[in-house]
Amino acid sequence: MRLSFHPRRLAATLAVGAISLAASLAPPALAPVSAKVFDPETFTLDNGLEVVVIANSRAPIVTHMVWYRVGAADEPPGKSGIAHFLEHLMFKGTETMAPGEFSEIIARNGGQENAFTSWDYTAYFQTIAKDRLELMMRFEADRMANLRLSDAVVDPERDVILEERRSRTDNEPGAQLSEMVTASLFLNHPYGIPIIGWEHEMRGLTTEDALAFYERWYAPNNAILVVAGDVTAEEVRGLAERYYGVIPARDLPDRVRPSEPKQLAPRRVTLESPRVRQPSLWIDYLAPSYGAGASEHAYPLQVLDEILGGGTTSRLYRRLVVEQAVAAGAGSGYGAGSVDLTNYRFYVTPRPGIELDAAEAALRAQIEALLESGVTEEEVAAAKTRMRSSAIYARDSLSTGANILGRSLATGQSVEDVESWPERIEAVTAEQVNAAARAVFDVRRSVTGVLLPKPTS
């Protein structure tokens, strides 16, 4: 089963997708604010393929990733789920490889692989011994240019993604509610359509639909190659030119995405299910990202998210769980790394014996207190210290750097945006955080999601 899609808000993010650490971890000695995060080397092939190399010689392994600047928000109307479906079908063979052969070879060589689809990008990766990097490039370049599909492989895989939807969404009340909340938050933008697709449209996806999407978007000049591990940029350049460099560029279409209208009224979505044991609630606000809306608020919102939702020492957890004892869990979530607008989420789960209405009232009181009194300079300073520490820890993992840089470039950011993230976070002031909160937390641009138990009859 592929790691096929992930939610808009990842629990761990750094800057262009921020990485948060448990508050219990002792921070390392902080490097100067101007220190590089990953210090990658970059170059572009003649056919437009961007290449990023993160040298890390701690172990003789590499992570090899290919990111395409296309995702579920780029699908034709009526074809929801085709980006994710194509991700599955990319493992079904080429002119020279049988279905599943790539995966079998990776497994025989002791490697790991996976792929994932978001609204903005699709990515494929392998982690393997460094002396198998050339093999990975040969196979990945082959399916970039030579994917071959037939109804014989497409039809059974359609059943696979339908079962994936049933298991991950239709049988999970929280996922169902999240789908409805997101559809209510984005009134016009395709972010309101689930990445996996609507079931009735998924059933109609065809071989021709998949090939058309592939031929439209999968090209070297719409891709980013990221290699992290025990390699040099020159080694990667030679291999990339040999395998990817021979693939011709394509004429790419514009990414046409409708924008959001002015939102005038709050919305509320309630879902009851006998599968729900404990009620919960969240409030989503339409929010700017690095690339859309009032983007000057993106970095302050990241600091605010650390203050409000950064673990068991955060403001919301401390006040609602520890001090008031009305909640079993409470926090917030915000990710700035999307092409278009994003969301800022508050959530609360009441403590057993506490009514959901009481927990909701306590959460809303905290939001009102934030808007009235703001955050303090001390809270901002502590949050920035924790966030800078997270950037240092992020260097330890091959996949973390490859993921952050790939995601950033795929959503319109630059390598410099990633490398300068600690400086940009350090420059955030309490005044900027409070201004961002006042700008974003407008109830008219919000959706409240309520998940309730439903007694079985």
Q: Across the structure, where does each feature detected by a protein language model lie?
A:
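Charge-rich, well-structured scaffold segments of protease-associated domains
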Residues: 2, 39, 44, 101-254, ...
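Active/ligand-binding-proximal structured segments within catalytic/core domains
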Residues: 48, 57-106, 283, 294-308, ...
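Short strand-connecting beta-turns/loops that link adjacent beta-strands
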Residues: 56-59, 219, 276-277
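Active-site-flanking beta-strand signature of metal-NTP-handling nucleotidyl enzymes
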Residues: 63-66, 280-285, 345, 447-449
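N- or domain-start disorder-to-order transition segments that initiate the globular core
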Residues: 33-39, 43-60
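N-terminal secretory signal peptides that target proteins for export/translocation
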Residues: 1-7
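Bacterial N-terminal signal peptides
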Residues: 11-28
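His/Glu-based metal-binding/catalytic segments typifying zinc-dependent metallopeptidases
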Residues: 166, 183, 252-313
